[in-house]
Amino acid sequence: MTAKPHISCQFKRDYPQLINLYPTCTIATQHSLDNLNRLRHQCLTALLTQPSPHLCVMGQWGLGDGIELLSFIHYWQTLAKTQNLPRLLLKVFEPNPINYYELKLLWDQSQSLILHPHLQPIANAIIEAKPARIIGCQRLIFDDGRISLDLDFGDLQTMLVNQPHCGTYPIQQWLILPHLAPQLSRKILWQMARLSADDAHFIGVELAETTQNLAKTCGFSPLTITADMLCGEQIDSIASQIVTDDILLHERKLLRQQANNHQAFTPRPSQVASTKQPIAIIGGGLASAHLMLSLAEREQSSILFCKDNDLGQGASGNRQGAIYPLLTPENDELSRFFQQAFLFSRRRIAALSLASMKGSDVASGVMPISHDFCGVLQTGHDERSQQRLDKIIQSQDWPAEIAYAVDASEANKIAKIGIDKAGFYYPLGGWVCPFEYAKAAVDKASQLANVQCHFNTEITEIERDAKGWYLLSQDQRFGPFRQLVLANGAQLTQFSASERLQISPFRGQVSHIPSQFQLSQLATVLCANGYLTPSHQGLHCLGASYVKAAEHLDFCPLEQLENLGKMQQSYPNQDWVEDIDISANSARVGVRMVTRDHFPMMGCAPDVNEIWARYEQHQINQQQAEQIRHYWQTTPAPIHDGLYILGGLGSRGLSSGPLAAECLAAQLTDEPLPLDWPTLNKLSPNRMWLRKLLKGKAL
């Protein structure tokens, strides 16, 4: 059973407010939109005629009512049917976040899609992707990765400053919508220039002369167009003449170097993946599966080495796992990352499920994913936890699509069993079967690229020479590979190159409970002291224990009792708790790897020995503390070249894993990232050491 609360009442903005924030552009007719699309495509001619360009990146300044965006996506999809186009990444920078409910309201009330009915399927796809009113980048992926949309919501200056520059695939073109053109300050334009190709086009709708002049001082050659021009028939004669200024281009280069130097302590890959050479991955769980999928969407081949006989036999092997964001009272980088990641994972589940339903299981080749977006209801279980939850609820004006407070009566209606206490409800959350989720990702990856899986292949050692990385099992040697990713969960620290990573194993036992009596009515995931899922195939999942550095992975009767005790403590005097029967001793035990700061690890593998060697060298002269901090800030941190880490997903891997994998895939192929610099710094596997060194503290 699924909880289906009516949440539209939680949204606060009505249509007059929305149309004021997201106004319709002067380009209203289909003829004008077609001409604008032709002009934008015409300006990309130089890029599209290059030998096999893999990706075209385009920026849009402002969302407006979204019609220009929908129209260009449709135009690109139509062209792609007859032309060999590269993949498309559209990055929309918008200061006012908007959610899927408001987008639908905006499009319905304005009747925009009635005037342009061919755009309805794209609009539906965006609405189904459930964008939220949150700060940061939300990546939406369509057409098996052929088209991606980054919704970069938040303060425009901050968003641009924190965007990493992508050398291989910079922004090739900007479309400036008129309602946000007045915000194009010199500082903002220089940041746009930093992120752009040196010959990027700068197209504005009725740009003011002052804005055009400002853009020119930052190295752009602005092309301003009017509604009258787009209504005419001479669109092919309009051309954007790129006038390059060596001094201004040098200023851009210096700005990029300055930004990169400022973030040098978070290293990025020194070499770009080649589609002709596979990337090696050691793993077999959710992280490695989604890395393979994200790479495959980029036509990048990969080879998985898995010690088990199938996917999802480690921490990803549970029958059900909850998916919802981790929120903090401060809504800091951790909280914002988990909101972005949770929504991305939710979209992955929906897309893979749709792929599995397009035909029979055999015909589609994608495993169906058992899941239910039934929501997650979080409640306190003692005075301290209740205070903590209240602080989270009251400290931020959370978007209703992320979470909202409910009273005891509403909690009972959502759960469809007795809760009798207030809580925090995550309406887009739910549960998913982790191992099916992993298998579906690899199934889809195999349709898009050359993907190989070597099962029953335990890699016992890795080594590197001038040609690359080699993987050694008991009887074979694989390689060389230019790039190797360690995504092997509980075995992440088994190699000499990764043994000093600051990450800890925690045993978790999940109890399997038969669905019966009142308990069978549970319609949402409960999260208190432990969690309880709705029934799936006649069983509920109850868990989980949390034991550091456990000596074994055998069934533990005491942990089974502790799981029951957590529900008894969380919901005392509720009759349905008596329906929880653990007597069958049915459970599953796994190990999740946890970091102290709860962020996953994603990025270049740190050379910890070299970090310590440099640290000890600098310790000799403590009088130069400021210079030492500057050294660690601006000097690329030591890494094992070509080796990468993807792990430490902890208890929230279903939420965090797919986005971490997407980000690593973008790094490996040098494509624009869906995360900003502050978040990348938090994810870096070297962060525990560099955090101290940047503050001048002892290791």
From Swiss-Prot:
Keywords, ordered alphabetically: Cytoplasm, FAD, Flavoprotein, Methyltransferase, Multifunctional enzyme, Oxidoreductase, S-adenosyl-L-methionine, Transferase, tRNA processing
First-listed, main subcellular location of the protein, grouped into a coarse class: cytoplasm
Region FAD-dependent cmnm(5)s(2)U34 oxidoreductase, annotated ranges: 282-699
Superkingdom, taxonomy of origin: Bacteria
Catalytic reaction annotation: 5-aminomethyl-2-thiouridine(34) in tRNA + S-adenosyl-L-methionine = 5-methylaminomethyl-2-thiouridine(34) in tRNA + S-adenosyl-L-homocysteine + H(+)
InterPro entries in alphabetical order: FAD-dep_OxRdtase (IPR006076), FAD/NAD-bd_sf (IPR036188), SAM-dependent_MTases_sf (IPR029063), tRNA_MAMT_biosynth_bifunc_MnmC (IPR023032), tRNA_S-uridine_synth_MnmC_C (IPR017610)
Biological process (GO), any one: tRNA wobble uridine modification
EC number(s) given by UniProt: 2.1.1.61, 1.5.-.-
Residue span of region tRNA (mnm(5)s(2)U34)-methyltransferase: 1-260
GO molecular function, one term: flavin adenine dinucleotide binding
Family per similarity comment: In the N-terminal section; belongs to the methyltransferase superfamily. tRNA (mnm(5)s(2)U34)-methyltransferase family.
NCBIfam families named in the record: MnmC_Cterm
The protein's name: tRNA 5-methylaminomethyl-2-thiouridine biosynthesis bifunctional protein MnmC
